[in-house]
Every structure is written in structure tokens, then in C-alpha cells.
């Protein structure tokens, strides 16, 4: 009672949880993981965070101030308020951002191509297709995005990312229920 139940088949992959046996939706659970090298999650994913919050509550002290998240197009390194967090291998970005409060933003202004930013809880950011995780050895199955926005715990909007800055290409930016500031930059956004 009060549990999550079985994970829906269309969410049973590393894109949503590291507690899966599937590299991508529809992959075999009897075989080993099929991700290419450097294409594994770099953080807990949205449903992992939701499960922990269900059991222990949400940590709204994590990055509770005004926080800007940005990534390097050449290395994939995450920067939090301009401070590098270490570059991932292979220039792939595959993570979820949980933020405890403040007025926060994704800054993808360093990207020359068009980016897709969905600020809705569980939404995906695609900074660059070249930086997407390859979830199959043949490279056919790509992650849905580079960065997932965490789900809201009990509908609490403190975890929303409110702002987004796109790249210099043709961007698509989707806001959320927060007071969003959405800047497309150059290009036809």
C-alpha cells in the first residue's frame, strides 16, 4: 500500500532509473547492458530520485539558492554557478538535475546548434545529439535527452528549474508552471 507498483514498460530503461535491467525501452532483460562505453547515467535518474524521496522525503537544501547549470559542448562538463564538476568520459551527458529551491536556470548559450529544453518535471534537455548517451552497442538507440529535470515531490514547485537560455541555433524551449524567463538567443526559436 502506498508503493509505486511495477514500472510501466515504456519507462523501464536507464533513461528513467538506474534500477533497471534494460539499457533502453524494449531491450532484452536477459542479456547484459548494451550501452556503449561512457553512455551510462552520471547521476540518479528521475524515478530513482522520486523513489528515494518517497521513502525519505525531499532534500530542499540541495542547491536551494539561485543556481545556474551549464554544460561544455566540447567536454560535457557540468558547471554549477560557473564551477566545474568534472568532465564525463566520451563527452556524453546523461543525468538528472535535482534542485531544492531558488530561481534556477539551464544555460546552453555555449552551444552553436539548436537545443531543445523542456523545463516541465521529467522533461528532457537535448543540448547536442553528439553528446547523447548511446544505449545500444550499434549506436541506434539514443537517450531521449542529455539532461532530465527531476519530478516534483508531492507537487512541491521548489524543485522547478524556472529559466532557460538556448544556444545560437534554432531552439525549442518549453516552460513550466513557474515564472519562466526563456531566452532563445540567436536563431529562429
Language model: regions and residue ranges:
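GD-rich hexapeptide-repeat beta-solenoids
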Residues: 2-12, 22-31, 54-82, 103-145
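Parallel beta-helix/beta-solenoid
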Residues: 14, 100-101, 156, 177
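Active-site rim elements
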Residues: 34-42, 83-85, 90-93, 147-150
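Extracellular/periplasmic catalytic domains that process cell-envelope and extracellular macromolecules
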Residues: 10-13, 88-89, 97-101
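Extracellular, beta-strand-rich repeat scaffolds characterized by small/acidic residue-biased motifs
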Residues: 101, 110-112, 121, 165-170, ...
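Discrete beta-strand positions within long extracellular beta-solenoid architectures
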Residues: 18, 96, 105, 116, ...
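Stable alpha-helical elements in mature extracytoplasmic
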Residues: 15, 45-51, 157
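Low-complexity, polar/charged sequence tracts that form flexible coils or short amphipathic helices
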Residues: 43, 88-89, 152-158, 164-166, ...
Amino acid at each position: 500500500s502506498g508503493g509505486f507498483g511495477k514500472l510501466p514498460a515504456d519507462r523501464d530503461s536507464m533513461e528513467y532509473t538506474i534500477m533497471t535491467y534494460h539499457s533502453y525501452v524494449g531491450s532484452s532483460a536477459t542479456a547484459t547492458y548494451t550501452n556503449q562505453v561512457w553512455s551510462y547515467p552520471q547521476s540518479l535518474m528521475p524515478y530513482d530520485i522520486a523513489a528515494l524521496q518517497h521513502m525519505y522525503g525531499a532534500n530542499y537544501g540541495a542547491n536551494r539558492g539561485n543556481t545556474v547549470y551549464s554544460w561544455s559542448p566540447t567536454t560535457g562538463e557540468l558547471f554549477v554557478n560557473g564551477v566545474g564538476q568534472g568532465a564525463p568520459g566520451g563527452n556524453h551527458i546523461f543525468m538528472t538535475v535535482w534542485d531544492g529551491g531558488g530561481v534556477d536556470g539551464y544555460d546552453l548559450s555555449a552551444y552553436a546548434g539548436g537545443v531543445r529544453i523542456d523545463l516541465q518535471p521529467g522533461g528532457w534537455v537535448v543540448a547536442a545529439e553528439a553528446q547523447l548517451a548511446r544505449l545500444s552497442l550499434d549506436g541506434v538507440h539514443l537517450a531521449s535527452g542529455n539532461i532530465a529535470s527531476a519530478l516534483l515531490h508531492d507537487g512541491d514547485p521548489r524543485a522547478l528549474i524556472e529559466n532557460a537560455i538556448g544556444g545560437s541555433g534554432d531552439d525549442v524551449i518549453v516552460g513550466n508552471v513557474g515564472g519562466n524567463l526563456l531566452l532563445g538567443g540567436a536563431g529562429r526559436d
